[in-house]
């Protein structure tokens, strides 16, 4: 009997090492700003859909695939770095008529609820604070992958997400409705375990 225990216990210990991390524990991640993109797009007088992006997002993500309702995300966007890829428009965006970055240099999103929709899809409800105004926003997120990252050699997770906000909710409504009130958000991120 002792020999059986001596043989079995190490096997159980080794097997435990191969339990997927997502099943073993709630994971805490730090967003990688270099692999996180936040892109905004809108309708421009009906002719086109220009884009602007806010690079260098930072934040944290807590994820538990077995209890997704306990997951949460907290992100800060440096609005001072917004880039429309048109220098004159970028300058206008940073001014008082739009984001007023001198007074409001960053925006934040803090989740309040995560709802599993099946097939690695989640609705992430939360509060977006922009220009000192806080409004509820829902992001529709897809889990791309969770596991060890081959380059950084850490546990990692990746999501894509989309959502829509109204410019008028945040006093960014210049030229509405000729330029659309609705702004689509397209987000992609990688995050690494702390």
Predicted features by range, described:
Residues 1-6:
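Positively charged n-region of N-terminal signal peptides that target proteins for export
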Residues 23-194:
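Low-complexity, acidic/polar, glycine-enriched regions of mature
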């Amino acid at each position: 009997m002792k020999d059986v225990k001596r043989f079995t216990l190490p096997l159980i210990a080794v097997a435990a090492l191969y339990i997927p991390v997502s099943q073993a524990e709630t994971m805490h991640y730090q967003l990688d700003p270099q692999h996180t993109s936040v892109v905004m797009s809108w309708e421009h007088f009906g002719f086109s859909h220009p884009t602007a992006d806010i690079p260098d997002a930072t934040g944290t993500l807590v994820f538990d695939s077995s209890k997704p309702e306990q997951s949460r995300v907290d992100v800060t966007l440096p609005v001072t770095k917004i880039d429309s890829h048109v220098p004159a428009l970028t300058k206008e965006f940073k001014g008082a008529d739009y984001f007023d970055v001198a007074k409001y240099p960053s925006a934040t999103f803090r989740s309040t609820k995560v709802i599993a929709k099946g097939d690695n899809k989640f609705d992430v409800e939360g509060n977006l604070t922009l220009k000192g105004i806080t409004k509820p926003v829902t992001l529709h997120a897809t889990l791309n992958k969770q596991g060890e990252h081959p380059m950084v050699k850490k546990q990692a997770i990746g999501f894509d997400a989309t959502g829509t906000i109204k410019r008028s909710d945040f006093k960014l409504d210049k030229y509405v409705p000729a330029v659309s009130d609705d702004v689509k958000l397209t987000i992609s991120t990688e995050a690494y375990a702390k």
